[in-house]
Design a protein with these regions (language model features):
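ABC ATPase NBD coupling module
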Residues: 16, 70-86, 100, 104, ...
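The feature captures the beta-strand-to-loop junction immediately N-terminal to the Walker
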Residues: 39-41
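Helix-to-loop junction immediately C-terminal to a conserved catalytic motif
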Residues: 54
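Conserved ABC ATPase "signature" region
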Residues: 117-134
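Conserved ABC ATPase signature
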Residues: 139-143, 147
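A short, proline-enriched helix->beta-strand linker immediately N-terminal to the Walker B motif
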Residues: 158-162
Length: 240
């Protein structure tokens, strides 16, 4: 059953000299438990689609359905969707408040949603992403890039989402740390039964993570790939 449905999605922005079309008529669907990826060069519209699905980009046209709920352009997410759809951003440092301890960063979403047993939930989240309990006392600048991205993933997992949106989650990390984070994401997906929508320009990341993928250029989805095509590296030729 498709838990994400996107039909004829278009997004435009005001730009110098006129209107820029960031996404033009994109259509795709995600099945429960799979990883579907969008690949393409920077500026092709991948991250804009993620922002629409996260409720961050509210000016768009088309039909979007998340977990059986039809999304209305211009409106904030309501109810369970605010918990069930979470996003991990490209730059972990920029997405973490520099003056908040890791404990505060992780505890605040739980408090906002009226959760109980906050101490235990924060400790559990850190353990799930392989961080020691004492990391909760630190500030973002006291952590490595890989550790900060683990915190960002832990924060997204705290509300036990069904859909995780991943915007270039390893592009700011060293190669050795990239593999650790990708393997962590795969393990967590299996443990929690989540569905991933991954954005990347890295053909190796797409092949490692994805069940299916689509190649974008100039706001348009030009080609789709199943798992066999990804294993054969067909997406590399499209991206070349």
């Amino acid at each position: 059953m498709a838990i994400v449905k996107v039909d004829n999605l278009s997004v435009q922005f005001a730009a110098k000299g006129g209107i820029k079309t960031a996404v033009a008529g994109a259509s795709f669907a995600l099945e429960q438990g799979e990883t579907f990826s969008l690949i393409g060069a920077s500026g092709c519209g991948k991250s804009t689609i993620l922002r629409v699905l996260a409720g961050l980009q509210r000016d768009w046209k088309g039909d979007v359905e998340l977990l059986g709920n039809r999304i209305t352009a211009g409106k904030r997410f309501q109810g369970a969707l605010r918990r069930e759809v979470q996003m991990v951003f490209q730059d972990p440092y920029a997405s973490l408040h520099p003056n908040h301890t890791i404990w505060r960063t992780l505890a605040e979403p739980l408090k906002i949603h009226g959760e109980s047993k906050i101490e235990a939930r924060v400790a559990e989240a850190l353990e799930q992403v392989g961080l020691p309990a004492e990391a909760a006392k630190r500030y973002p600048h006291q952590l490595s890039g890989g550790q900060r991205q683990r915190v960002a993933i832990a924060r997204a997992l705290l509300l036990r989402p069904k859909i995780l949106l991943l915007d270039e989650p390893t592009s700011a990390l060293d190669m050795s740390v990239q593999a650790e984070i990708l393997n962590l994401l795969n393990r967590l997906k299996q443990q929690h039964g989540m569905t991933y929508l991954l954005v990347s320009h890295d053909a190796d990341v797409i092949a490692h993570m994805s069940d299916r993928a689509a190649f974008m250029a100039n706001g348009v989805i030009e080609r789709s790939f199943d798992r066999a095509a990804l294993v054969n590296g067909e997406h590399r030729m499209a991206h070349a």
